[in-house]
Amino acid sequence: NGTDMSELNTNNRYNEYTYDFYVGFSKNMGEHLSFSASITGEYYKTARYHAWAAYPTTELTYVMTPAHILQLSFTSDKTYPSYWDLSKSTGYISGYEEVQGNPMLKPSTDYSANLNYILKNKYIFSLAYDYQPDLFQQLAYQSTERLALIYKTLNWDYQQSFSATTIIPFKIGHWLDSHVTLQAEYRQAKCNKFFDLSFNHSKWIGLAMLQNNIILSTKPDIRMELTGLYLSPSIQGNYDLNHIWAIHTGIRWNFANQKASIQVKANDLFNSMEGNIDVTLRNKGQYMDMHTNNYSRNITLSFTYKFGGYKEKQHKPIDTSRFK
């Protein structure tokens, strides 16, 4: 007798239709106030799901004086699940771990409201609220029916966050130009139908980042970029994640009357951003500790030469995100 392999078939046909329209306008009301608004309407249809949706966007700018500017904005957008996540098939990582597709996934929406205060065209103070109904992400579930760890992408009820951000630039002489970014965020993720469970997970998260542009020499023209960041312990759905940190750096030499340059860049120099992540799950009988170790360090060497007044044409890249 042979083994039934029907569930291993990854051949799928998926039909998807979208119809949309766009309307927008902008208006200057005197010297101090400007306003713009737009709305995109969309009809989205698959074999298992169809819906009308509207995605409005507004922005209001009030210039009290050149040194004091207020900006209030509201944006909305959508994210579609990848075609792989929409597959009916099941893939097996090991005898214990498996990845299940979910053809019932629907798009998620992102609503964002931001209030920015810009002081002296340098200092930025921001308050933001972000609400994402039907957010989808892949999470792990320990089956209560068999010995299996199931990875599956599901739509949650929502994820929301409140954040306050401060950006402070400063200079030291003519050789150092720096920016400090500080952010405090409250994040909440809620899902009432996560297999046979539910979760309502929240946490305060802090981010600190320092970006430096350093002139090492003017003759020859040698410049350095150095960025460091720290993210406090955070959450992803019902997961708890440990803190992460990273250092990015690069050196550029400009010569031949600024027409030529050689640049060396190193991102995540110590492989600390994705190379050492601890995932903890403690939710209604679900108990898991997982350590991931990805290699995220990369070093690039590039040479650039500008011929005359040549300017590179900007080409819109093809969106391949849903094929990953």
Where are these regions (language model features)?
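Residues that define the transmembrane beta-barrel architecture of outer-membrane proteins
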Residues: 13-19, 50-54, 107-113, 119, ...
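Transmembrane beta-strands of outer-membrane beta-barrel pores
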Residues: 39-47, 74-80, 90, 121, ...
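Repeated loop/turn-to-beta-strand initiation elements of outer-membrane beta-barrel proteins
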Residues: 31-35, 67-70, 121-127, 174-179, ...
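Outer-membrane beta-barrel signature, preferentially recognizing the C-terminal barrel domain
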Residues: 78-127, 131-133, 149-163, 171, ...
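C-terminal beta-signal and adjacent terminal beta-strands/loops
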Residues: 255-324
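Surface-exposed extracellular loop regions of Gram-negative outer-membrane beta-barrel proteins
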Residues: 13-61, 175-186, 207-233
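Residues on the lipid-exposed face of transmembrane beta-strands in outer-membrane beta-barrel proteins
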Residues: 19-27, 58-62, 113-119, 164-170, ...
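C-terminal beta-barrel architecture of Gram-negative outer-membrane proteins
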Residues: 208-254, 267-279, 283-287
